[in-house]
Amino acid sequence: MSQSNRVRDEVTLPLLQKTSHLKNHSSVLSVFLNEAISICKISYPLVLTGLFLYVRSFVSLSFLGGLGDATLAGGSLAAAFANITGYSLFSGLTMGVESICSQAFGARRYNYVCASVKRGIILLLVTSLPVTLLWMNMEKILLILKQDKKLASEAHIFLLYSVPDLVAQSFLHPLRVYLRTQSKTLPLSICTVIASFLHLPITFFLVSYLGLGIKGIALSGVVSNFNLVAFLFLYICFFEDKLSVNEDEKITEETCEDSVREWKKLLCLAIPSCISVCLEWWCYEIMILLCGFLLDPKASVASMGILIQITSLVYIFPHSLSLGVSTRVGNELGSNQPKRARRAAIVGLGLSIALGFTAFAFTVSVRNTWAMFFTDDKEIMKLTAMALPIVGLCELGNCPQTTGCGVLRGSARPKIGANINGVAFYAVGIPVGAVLAFWFGFGFKGLWLGMLAAQITCVIGMMAATCRTDWELEAERAKVLTTAVDCGSSDDDAKEDMEAGMVDK
């Protein structure tokens, strides 16, 4: 009998322990799976949004091509300068608004979310004034840069008729942030789909029926964006569930807001975010300029344009994931849940690695066919096929790097991202690419190897910043960030510590 008990103890207890371990592993897996589902629920409608906007740009490009080579070249030149001088600024500045709104929503400070969105709209409207002046004088600037007169004239017309779009974008970016930080991305996606479907008939009416040419293409983009703004306003005003605001927040907002300090808080996040975005966007434009100095500049520039089309398509996916991770991290830090914020960051980075391998496989698989969608020139097709595997390796690093940016944005540390991008793209990427292309004779391939070096540097920096994050400290900073400043408040030192910590971490 004693032997039977001993056998039973020796056998049964380990089985119970194994069962307990399995339950624990199952519980951990379930928690991480639920987090992945939460991130994907935010991100997948954003993927749909991005794809429809991508198709919309193709529609405009097709109409430009139908107007002749000079109009196509002029419109493409205008789009490049619009990205460099306008849209990159708007996108970057909005990231600062997103950092505040995501944490404020997590802290249930809904009035503060609305106030931050309003400040974001004002900031972008003010920014649009110097951009407008720049666009109105773009023909002179292009001629100074030794561009062809005809191309400069076409680009100037396109930009001149695109000026109202700056107003639309000033409302559109903050409204997207407002919905995204509440995880309401499906309504945003539906509104974008409707506006995108209307874009084709609007463009046809303005270009083909009214015969406005390049003016009509520019105006169709303006009308489509104003339609999207109108749809978002209609949803927010009539269909959105109204956010309940607690009384303590009402009193604080009504009696003690220090607008100067709040603007300083916003600008401390918006300006570094803007620098970070612009550094990355501008790097690709510099690569196009460098292509003009290669042995076959025409084929190199054309191939670079085709490759940027595929990187833009692939970028929709990590960018959408990044926005989802940013929202989850910001919401959890705002609600004082540092462990959950850390979990969201880990799960997001895990998803981004899987996405990176998918992007790599896609770019390699289409290396011999992608250029056929744009040209039948053998030399351009050869250059594109040669570079696409390197582009795939770039995307392998770009996916976790972009998601890392989302983690930094959700934890309101944009200065770290700006520093990493500055070093990666301008101290590593462009110099390495230029040396390989011109000094060692790698040519077009060398430029993309430089971009690969930049992405490797970037992903190492982002991973290091994420791994070194003190999540408890970030939760404390979130409390400071999402608290409206009292008139005569005594916690100025805490705010200064928070701002300094955005760089020191």
Swiss-Prot record:
Subcellular location: Cell membrane; Late endosome membrane
Transmembrane annotation, as ranges: 46-66, 78-98, 121-141, 155-175, 194-214, 219-239, 275-295, 305-325, 344-364, 380-400, 424-444, 446-466
Tissues in which the protein is found: Preferentially expressed in rosette leaves. Detected mainly in the vascular tissues and guard cells. Mostly detected at reproductive stages in young anthers, in mature pollens and during pollen germination on the pistil. Also expressed in developing seeds.
GO molecular function terms noted in the UniProt entry: abscisic acid transmembrane transporter activity; antiporter activity; xenobiotic transmembrane transporter activity
Top-rank taxon, per record: Eukaryota
Phenotype seen when the gene is deleted: Smaller and yellowish rosette leaves. Enhanced sensitivity to abscisic acid (ABA) in growth inhibition and seed germination. Accumulation of ABA in leaves. Enhanced tolerance to drought with lower stomatal conductance.
GO biological process: abscisic acid transport; regulation of response to water deprivation; response to abscisic acid; root morphogenesis; xenobiotic detoxification by transmembrane export across the plasma membrane
Family, per entry: Belongs to the multi antimicrobial extrusion (MATE) (TC 2.A.66.1) family.
NCBIfam families assigned to the protein according to its UniProt record, in alphabetical order: matE
Misc note: Overexpression of DTX50 alters shoot developmental programs leading to a loss of apical dominance phenotype.
Protein name, as recorded: Protein DETOXIFICATION 50
